[in-house]
A protein has these predicted regions:
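Flexible extramembrane linkers and terminal tails adjacent to transmembrane helices
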Residues: 1-11, 25-40, 61-139, 144-225, ...
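Short glycine-rich, polar/acidic loop-and-turn segments at beta strand-coil junctions
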Residues: 21, 29-31, 46-47, 55
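Hydrophobic alpha-helical transmembrane segments
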Residues: 53, 57-60
Length: 262
């Protein structure tokens, strides 16, 4: 797909509003904070999260689509798994530049309950806060992008070619592809996400300092299991998100840009 269609598809997804409660519960669990069932609390920071998901997904689709075009260089063939994954990793890393500050706003709103404007003012009072947690975000997004942009198409194609009777079309193969992509994206990236979330929830640096200091603190408090706090909520959200976005990529993409799927 070309650059512009990829950007358009990146903006068109409804999953952030549907899955915000999963995101809230995951963030609170990672920081060892109580979970509220009040929808007004669960949806704190949803505006920043919507912008985050829209902009990051747009960047990932656009950069990933352009890189795949460059790799193919006009050839009519499928990308290899390595080529798919390399494109996803690069696209995800770039998207972290936008995603990290926006997630910081969301997490601070969830922790403090301030308005959007007050939260931005609180963060920018110390400019060093703006990119707090970027390393964790960049690594997580790099691997996550592989999980939803790179792995599902390869898995779907492999299942349909290897087991054509069981998986005769994309619709049948999509569910196992989403489960595998979500599993890869969740458990491989979750330790980085936990470190990032703890750092962004503590901009005052009372408990968590740098990336390495935060990782050491989590390990000393809870051993390796501390890095997987909130993983159940995240995996549930990711499987739903991968399914929605893989479906959207195919159905909406084909409707808007049929020539790209010829």
């Amino acid at each position: 797909m070309s650059f512009c269609p990829s950007m358009c598809l990146g903006c068109l997804h409804p999953q952030v509003l549907l899955l915000q409660p999963f995101n809230y519960a995951k963030n609170m669990t990672q920081q060892k904070q109580p979970i509220s069932l009040n929808p007004l609390v669960m949806y704190r920071g949803v505006h920043a999260n919507a912008v985050n998901m829209g902009s990051c997904t747009m960047i990932q689709f656009a950069v990933g689509g352009r890189l795949k075009q460059m790799i193919l260089n006009g050839e009519s063939r499928h990308l290899s798994l390595g080529e798919e994954m390399a494109s996803g990793i690069a696209a995800g890393t770039v998207s972290g530049l936008a995603g990290s500050p926006l997630e910081l706003i969301m997490i601070q709103q969830q922790r403090k309950g301030l308005s959007l404007g007050a939260t931005i003012g609180d963060i920018t009072a110390k400019p060093a806060n703006i990119m707090r947690g970027f390393v964790g975000c960049a690594v997580r997004e790099a691997l996550w992008t592989c999980g939803y942009l790179s792995i599902p198409p390869v898995v779907r194609r492999t299942l349909m070619e290897t087991y054509p009777d069981t998986f005769p079309d994309n619709n049948r193969a999509r569910i196992p592809a989403a489960l595998l992509g979500g599993l890869f994206a969740c458990y491989l990236t979750h330790p980085f996400d936990t470190v990032k979330t703890c750092m962004q929830g503590d901009i005052e640096r009372k408990i968590y300092g740098t990336f390495s200091q935060t990782a050491a603190k989590i390990f000393s408090d809870s051993s390796i299991f501390g890095f997987y706090r909130g993983a159940t909520f995240r995996y549930g959200r990711m499987c739903c998100a991968v399914f929605i976005m893989d479906l959207l990529k195919e159905k909406v993409g084909y409707a808007l840009y049929p020539e790209a799927f010829a």
